[in-house]
Amino acid sequence: MGNKIAVIPGTFDPITNGHLDIIERAAKIFDVLYVAVLNNSSKKPLFTVEERMEMIKQVTAHLPNVAVESASGLTVDYAAKRGATAIVRGLRAVSDFEYEMQIASMNRTLNAEIETFFVMTNTKYSFLSSSMVKEVAQYQGDISELVPEMVNRAIQVKFNK
């Protein structure tokens, strides 16, 4: 059997300690892990895709089996092109599960060869989202425990602090 390849998709605008926790845990399970940075047209991003990719590359530099790429279109198609057999998704709460289950079911319908793996977020990050980080930062709240240090600095620059 060849390498176990997985994809973790997301907008990561910005990457949080919760995202990083899921990436680090998945990197222990899979031989190759692609972090697919999505350009979600329904969201107005704080950071460009390129900026997000660079931040993720920096905070995952200690993980030699992690590759960071941009992706568009269906995640299941991207996963198939990369030879992945798994899509990894982090779950914060039961409310996440309902939405993620619908996506996983659709992905399975589109490509039965690719499984979705749900990873429960560490409880200390169960409340955390990129949107929340941006909102707190916008109002000068302390986000230093919520994001990696270099991401914190980048956010401070964006909000001109």
UniProtKB/Swiss-Prot annotation:
The protein's annotated pathway: Cofactor biosynthesis; coenzyme A biosynthesis; CoA from (R)-pantothenate: step 4/5
Binding site for ATP: 11-12, 19, 90-92, 100, 125-131
GO CC annotation, single: cytoplasm
Signal sequence bounds: none
Cofactor needs: Mg(2+)
InterPro entries to which the protein is assigned, alphabetical: Cyt_trans-like, PPAT, Rossmann-like_a/b/a_fold
Chief location bin: cytoplasm
EC number(s) per entry: 2.7.7.3
Binding site for substrate: 11, 43, 75, 89
Keyword Cytoplasm listed: yes
Subunit structure: Homohexamer.
The family this protein is said to belong to: Belongs to the bacterial CoaD family.
Record-given protein name: Phosphopantetheine adenylyltransferase
Species name: Listeria welshimeri serovar 6b (strain ATCC 35897 / DSM 20650 / CCUG 15529 / CIP 8149 / NCTC 11857 / SLCC 5334 / V8)
Name of encoding gene: coaD
